[in-house]
Amino acid sequence: MNKVGLAMLLVAALLSSVHTRPHNAWEQKCSHALEMITKGRELLKDGDVVLRLHNSRASAIIRDFNRVDKSYSHAGVVLMEGGCPMVYHIMPSEDNRKGIIRKDSFLQFCNPAENTAYGIYRYQLSRKELAQEKIILQQWFEKRIAFDPLFDLQTDERMYCSEMVAKLMLRLFSNDFF
């Protein structure tokens, strides 16, 4: 057998041993989750509220505060930027409790390696309300609103995720929201 034939045989053997499907259950789960996130990403519009359930112990505790629906532990609001959905949200940083408002891509926000579920909720916002929502979120982002570890509703200088969403909706809909 000549060198070219031997090389082709080796390449064929190598290619036949490569798997294109995930090898184990965790990889299959992540693959399915990424597919679901991709489908969700295609549905997103400005103003959508995105919810998620992080797989940490702290998220399980936070989730249990909800008396009605314990499906999620964190929330953010979508603004499309260059056709890409960015999720504005507030959470403590990983190394300390002094996190600030941030914007992450939808894929990063819902990362299946760190989260077990996500949901999308859409309010029926007018163009005027959407424009106002963008202004408010961008102002909060520029102000670098800090995470509020005390969960104090009396100030807008510090907020936690669901407080940010609620206060945003209150500004858009006034007191008719609740």
Regions found by a protein language model. Give the residues of each.
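Positively charged n-region of N-terminal signal peptides that target proteins for export
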Residues: M1-V4
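Bacterial N-terminal signal peptides
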Residues: A7-A13
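N-terminal signal peptide c-region/cleavage motif recognized by signal peptidases
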Residues: L15-S17
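N-terminal accessory segments that precede or flank the first globular/catalytic domain
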Residues: T20-E81
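Membrane-targeting and insertion segments and their boundary/processing signals
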Residues: N24, D46, V50, L107, ...
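Glycine-rich catalytic cores of cysteine/serine-nucleophile enzymes that process amide/ester linkages
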Residues: H54-I120, F147-T155
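Active-site nucleophile-His-acid catalytic modules used for acyl/amide transfer and hydrolysis
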Residues: I61, T116-F178
